Swiss-Prot record:
It is found in: Cytoplasm. One of its GO terms (cellular component) is cytoplasm. NCBIfam families: dephospho-CoA kinase. ATP binds at A12, S13, G14, K15, S16, T17. Gene3D superfamilies: P-loop containing nucleotide triphosphate hydrolases (3.40.50.300). Belongs to the CoaE family. Residues 4-203 form the DPCK domain. It holds the Pfam family CoaE. The gene is coaE. PROSITE patterns: DPCK. It comes from Staphylococcus aureus (strain Mu50 / ATCC 700699). This is Dephospho-CoA kinase. Pathway: Cofactor biosynthesis; coenzyme A biosynthesis; CoA from (R)-pantothenate: step 5/5.
Length: 207
């Protein structure tokens, strides 16, 4: 019977890389970030609701959501984050549920790629939770390089989520991403072998 696995981690923990690798191994990935973008795409009901609640500043000159404006707004005003989530989350849930059910019907194991799985208390909607683990210092380094953030901004984003250590304690399985991409792939393969998703290589004996 196909399984539904929740994949999560801290910001800049390497979760996207793990998602890509899992799709190579035959899993179907349902991406919460992708669903969130679809929920407020140009011309959508979701975007119309955003404009109604947050005003014209929330929409850029191309008729799309002004992500920089909205990002700063919700990051600095928690009550605004709740208002935005109240618009987006129900739409995202519907998009993801439809995609998940379609894959399950086809017999695939499904990865629900959800960055804020624990924060939104969604762990009971999946069969297992896998956490991609790295250290907070690596998270901050990656954020500063990837997003061109100051150390203070990187810290603020890391600390706005449940800590990676706590998430790891709450997970069914932890995927170590303290090393490079090759080590990450090897760690993931080991987990997939142990859980029976892929076969262990049988090198046999030479004659």
């Amino acid at each position: 019977m196909p399984k539904v696995i929740g994949l999560t981690g801290g910001i800049a923990s390497g979760k996207s890389t793990v998602s890509e690798l899992l799709s190579v191994f035959g899993f179907k990935v349902v991406d919460a970030d992708k669903a969130a973008r679809e929920a407020v795409k140009k011309g959508s009901k979701g975007l119309a609701q955003v404009r109604e609640v947050f005003g014209d500043e929330a929409i850029d000159e191309n008729g799309e959501m002004n992500r920089r404006y909205m990002g700063d707004l919700v990051f600095n005003h928690p009550e605004k984050r709740l208002e935005l989530n109240a618009i987006i989350h129900p739409i995202v849930r519907d998009i993801m549920e439809e995609e998940k059910q379609e894959y399950l019907k086809q017999g695939y194991n499904v990865i629900m790629d959800i960055p804020l799985l624990f924060e939104n208390e969604l762990e009971n909607t999946v069969d297992e939770v896998w956490v991609v683990y790295t250290s907070e210092s690596i998270q901050m380094d990656r954020l500063m390089q990837r997003n061109n953030l100051s150390l203070e901004d990187a810290k603020a984003r890391v600390y706005s989520q449940i800590s990676i250590d706590k998430k790891s304690r709450m997970a069914d399985h932890v995927i170590d991403n303290l090393g490079d991409k090759l080590e990450l792939k090897q760690n993931l393969e080991r987990l997939l072998e142990e859980e029976g998703y892929i076969e262990k290589p049988n090198y046999g004996e030479e004659d």
